Amino acid sequence: DKKYIWFSSSNQFRGTSVGGPVHFIGNPADKTVYVTEGALKADIAHAFCKKTFVALAGVSHYRALEPIFAQLKRNGVENIVEAYDMDKYTNPHVEKSCMQMMEMANAYGFSVHRLCWDKKYKGIDDWLASRKKRN
């Protein structure tokens, strides 16, 4: 079930691939930044909670965060909160990528935290939306 369509010209002469774009929404100087997967998910989560989010195109693209983490460190960010989908507890591929991202954040000197919510909500956007409906 794909939410995004990626356009590429890699099959064309001098074309280019999509790469692994990183999406950012919020204040780049917040003390805490949340890392999730999917730009739309980050935008929805930000709309609900007004926190700062960085979103990967997919969990395996965590290396694309290196320049982002470097800049966030220069901006004074102190905390990185892992907010990957809840399948991080059931999918070994997601769990491995999650741990690699957290190790990278730790190597940059961030205090790293893991966010957990009710597993019946896959993503942070779903969980925040459910909380909004209850209030």
Question: Language model features by range: what are they?
Answer:
Residues L40, S60-R63, Y84-C98:
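Acidic, metal-coordinating catalytic cores used for nucleic-acid/nucleotide bond scission
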